[in-house]
């Protein structure tokens, strides 16, 4: 039995006593205890692939702040790593793959990894974290979106231009659709396995959906997100595991995402919550959408922005604050002040009381 089920209730658009709050990358380098754990573990991957260390890091922000959820400490690129692309990290450059897939032959060789063998470390981490949380708050599991994972798999790492994957979209769309189909199968299996291991809410990160034109988004990202929402078994009624579809730069597609079958849509700060709520039309909960840079502001500025965000959602939702989870519009940065996170969380709790 959960002691704090605000997140799950809000994602399912049920009444809550205040707006729940959690933060993307709430377990991260801005915390000195995280940096100490990373120094001890030796690398990011060493932490992510050790269930006990992943649990330790997941719980660190909850030991500091009264957040309404824990999110699994992992990476969106675990699926392609398990497919054989071999993930590694370069300091200052981010994630890379030793074996990117750039032609039809390489793409057709890919298969869906076995979740309890190649990705057992993720499921073990979920199980350990659930045990340690002991019902205090829900645990969120997650995956990258098919389009975002395909970007990394084809580019071989992060990119500014996405030239290789966009060239494939124009020159060999059937090959790209084959890749996206295989990755979607894997994402559905991955999220289902996390749910079976104990994840109580699930989020898909479509980090790079916003680099697509509207026509390409509707061809190469949205259909696969919709397939996940339709095919991922999440239970029924009050016990249903809510699914959040988050995307950077997805404001123009809120109405499409609200029709996808997911329980919630996560938006960034490039659309007002009032506008997003009007587009959603009460079909889904909304999550967001403070600009992470707000945390560089003074405590008073942070409180002001929290108030504006809460009010903006209510303005677009017929005056009601139900069906909203307050979050950032993207992840936290390493140079942010932990004390400012405390200010943000306290402001949400105080200003959103029903």
UniProtKB/Swiss-Prot annotation:
One of its GO terms (biological process) is protoporphyrinogen IX biosynthetic process from glutamate. The keyword Cytoplasm applies. Its EC number is 4.1.1.37. It catalyses: uroporphyrinogen III + 4 H(+) = coproporphyrinogen III + 4 CO2. NCBIfam families: hemE. The record marks 75 as: Transition state stabilizer. GO terms for cellular component: cytosol. Pathway: Porphyrin-containing compound metabolism; protoporphyrin-IX biosynthesis; coproporphyrinogen-III from 5-aminolevulinate: step 4/4. HAMAP family: URO_D. CDD domains: URO-D (cd00717). Belongs to the uroporphyrinogen decarboxylase family. This is Uroporphyrinogen decarboxylase. Homodimer. One of its GO terms (molecular function) is uroporphyrinogen decarboxylase activity. It is an enzyme of class 4 (lyase).
